[in-house]
């Protein structure tokens, strides 16, 4: 209380960034194996902000049909074209990727662990297909971070594709201490772009 008072009276974009924000972002980046991280009030807010800020009419978002509702809502805010593939159907995903080669960015959008059924994304196969078609991979790992992988880093660790997933979102409200908050974790370039948007 002596150092920080009772807390910020609003979000950091209004009241400013404190050293504890950056410290947590650095620790999350180190844990997740990414270059940088940006904190949000919740993962729902992270998912709401990521697509609109990064993608335009020149791009396409290709989502697993069972992604979390917050991802669907976030995609709707973006001007990017939107498409879906049958749940965990890699042949259908490949058809979709091949059909959108005219787009600037092709982004495969998935959960790491699907919250309704508890099944895992076939992330190793998704990443391989994305690399074949020069596409990006977005994973909401809210239900995997802290649980999946040898050291709890999430579905990208579990499937052996750490460093090959372009954008991770997640929550601090589950395995990571039960606090509130969410994050986007990615390359330094992507996170700096998001900070400026």
Annotate each language-model stretch with its function.
Residues 83, 87-139:
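Active-site phosphate-binding strand-loop segment of PLP-dependent enzymes
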Residues 133-136, 143, 148-197:
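Active-site C-terminal subdomain of aminotransferase-like
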Residues 50-69:
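Conserved PLP-anchoring active-site segment centered on the Schiff-base-forming lysine
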Residues 57, 77-79, 133, 164:
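Short, structured coil segments at secondary-structure junctions
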């Amino acid at each position: 209380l002596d150092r920080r008072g009772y807390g910020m009276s609003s979000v950091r974009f209004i009241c400013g960034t404190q050293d504890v924000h950056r410290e947590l972002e650095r620790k999350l980046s180190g844990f997740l194996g990414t270059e940088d991280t940006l904190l949000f009030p919740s993962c729902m807010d992270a998912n709401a902000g990521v697509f609109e800020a990064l993608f335009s009419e020149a791009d396409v978002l290709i989502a697993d049909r069972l992604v979390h509702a917050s991802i669907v809502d976030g995609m709707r805010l973006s001007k990017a074209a939107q498409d879906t593939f049958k749940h965990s159907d890699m042949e259908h995903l490949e058809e979709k990727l091949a059909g959108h080669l005219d787009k600037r960015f092709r982004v495969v959008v998935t959960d790491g662990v699907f919250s309704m059924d508890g099944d895992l994304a076939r992330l190793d196969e998704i990443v391989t297909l994305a690399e074949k078609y020069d596409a990006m991979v977005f994973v909401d790992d809210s239900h995997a971070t802290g649980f999946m992988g040898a050291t709890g880093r999430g579905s990208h660790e579990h499937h052996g594709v750490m460093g090959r997933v372009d954008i991770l979102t997640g929550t601090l409200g589950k395995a990571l201490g039960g606090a509130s908050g969410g994050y986007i974790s990615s390359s330094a370039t992507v996170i700096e772009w998001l900070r400026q948007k």
